[in-house]
């Protein structure tokens, strides 16, 4: 009798437990972790959906996927491997300047005097680059305030036909140098270019001489000219404005040279080992003055300009 009663009670308790589980929405074999808690599941789904739908970028070094919001917040430096990803010209300048007072050179537009055609006409290439970057040319020039310093600054946009230097790029750089000369303020240039623009032929090559002459006028007047070498800098830009600064800074692992590694190897018939043409290699051989992490770049530029211009360093006060 006692045994029958115990069996009945056990069965009753088991039935109650089953009913309770069904009431809580659990199925057979479902663990406590899988039990739905009101509100929590919906929040998790919303968060996961937001991450999946937010625009992301894959790091070209470690291949990690980074949301664009996180990338912008970290100055386009990979939070996983510290690789420096490209920045657009306008983002660089807005990032550098505390106050933008104006832009130079917007009146200059590219012409096609050679009627150059490779796989497509030059005007078509220009239109594609303008649509891609939302910029009219490969060089952007702004002037404004870096803390307590007035400066003129320019930056190449490598997305615009490889940051190539044509007549408009030359015009804008010369105008930037003339503005710095007239106002007696420093000029800072962020270089990122594949070199002279082949679609403009000799007109493009002439910009090397024009920009060099403009920099020489700054030197004679004692106006500081600082160059930041980003990845990559090659060709006619390296052979002119990018290597004529008073101070040369470089971002980590930036590729810097005149001809590319493959061209040099084919010419000298030797294999060139890494880190040939990297910023660190050039620092070791005295070509650049300092390799600076992007997070320290603004402070470094300001510190150098404050010293060169003999103005009080507000960071030191």
UniProtKB/Swiss-Prot annotation:
It is found in: Cytoplasm. GO terms for cellular component: acetate CoA-transferase complex. The keyword GTP-binding does not apply. One of its GO terms (biological process) is fatty acid biosynthetic process. It comes from the Bacteria. A zinc finger (C4-type) spans 59-81. Pathway: Lipid metabolism; malonyl-CoA biosynthesis; malonyl-CoA from acetyl-CoA: step 1/1. Zn(2+) binds at residues 59, 62, 78, 81. One of its GO terms (molecular function) is ATP binding. Binds 1 zinc ion per subunit. Keywords: ATP-binding, Cytoplasm, Fatty acid biosynthesis, Fatty acid metabolism, Lipid biosynthesis, Lipid metabolism, Metal-binding, Nucleotide-binding, Transferase, Zinc, Zinc-finger. It catalyses: N(6)-carboxybiotinyl-L-lysyl-[protein] + acetyl-CoA = N(6)-biotinyl-L-lysyl-[protein] + malonyl-CoA. InterPro entries: AcCoA_carboxyl_beta, Acetyl_CoA_COase_Trfase_b_su, ClpP/crotonase-like_dom_sf, COA_CT_N. Residues 55-317 form the CoA carboxyltransferase N-terminal domain. Residues 1-28 are annotated as: Disordered. Its EC number is 2.1.3.15. The keyword Ubl conjugation does not apply. Component of the acetyl coenzyme A carboxylase (ACC) complex. Biotin carboxylase (BC) catalyzes the carboxylation of biotin on its carrier protein (BCCP) and then the CO(2) group is transferred by the transcarboxylase to acetyl-CoA to form malonyl-CoA. Belongs to the AccD/PCCB family. This is Acetyl-coenzyme A carboxylase carboxyl transferase subunit beta. It comes from Psychrobacter arcticus (strain DSM 17307 / VKM B-2377 / 273-4). The gene is accD.
């Amino acid at each position: 009798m006692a045994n029958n009663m115990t069996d009945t009670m056990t069965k009753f308790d088991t039935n109650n437990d089953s009913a309770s589980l069904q009431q809580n929405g659990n199925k057979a074999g479902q663990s406590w972790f899988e039990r739905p808690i009101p509100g929590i599941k919906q929040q998790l789904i919303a968060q996961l959906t937001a991450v999946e739908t937010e625009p992301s970028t894959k790091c070209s070094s470690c291949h990690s996927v980074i949301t664009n919001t996180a990338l912008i917040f970290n100055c386009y430096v990979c939070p996983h491997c510290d690789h420096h990803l490209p920045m657009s010209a306008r983002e660089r300048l807005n990032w550098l300047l505390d106050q933008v007072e104006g832009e130079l050179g917007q009146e200059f537009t590219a012409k096609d005097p050679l009627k150059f055609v490779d796989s497509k006409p030059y005007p078509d290439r220009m239109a594609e680059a303008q649509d891609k970057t939302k910029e009219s040319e490969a060089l952007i020039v702004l002037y404004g305030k870096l803390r307590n310093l007035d400066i003129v600054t320019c930056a190449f946009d490598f997305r615009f036909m490889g940051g190539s230097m044509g007549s408009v790029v030359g015009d804008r750089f010369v105008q930037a140098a003339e503005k710095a000369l007239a106002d007696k303020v420093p000029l800072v240039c962020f270089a990122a270019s594949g070199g002279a623009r082949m679609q403009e032929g000799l007109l493009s090559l002439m910009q090397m001489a024009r920009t060099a002459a403009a920099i020489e006028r700054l030197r004679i007047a004692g106006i500081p000219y600082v160059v930041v070498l980003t990845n990559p800098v090659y060709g006619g830009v390296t052979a002119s404005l990018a290597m004529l600064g008073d101070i040369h800074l470089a971002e980590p692992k930036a590729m810097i040279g005149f001809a590319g590694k493959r061209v040099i190897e084919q010419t000298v018939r030797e294999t060139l080992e890494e880190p040939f043409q990297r910023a660190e290699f050039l620092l070791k051989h005295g070509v650049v003055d300092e390799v600076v992490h992007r997070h320290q770049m603004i402070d470094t530029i300001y510190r150098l300009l404050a010293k060169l211009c003999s103005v009080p360093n507000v960071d030191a006060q």
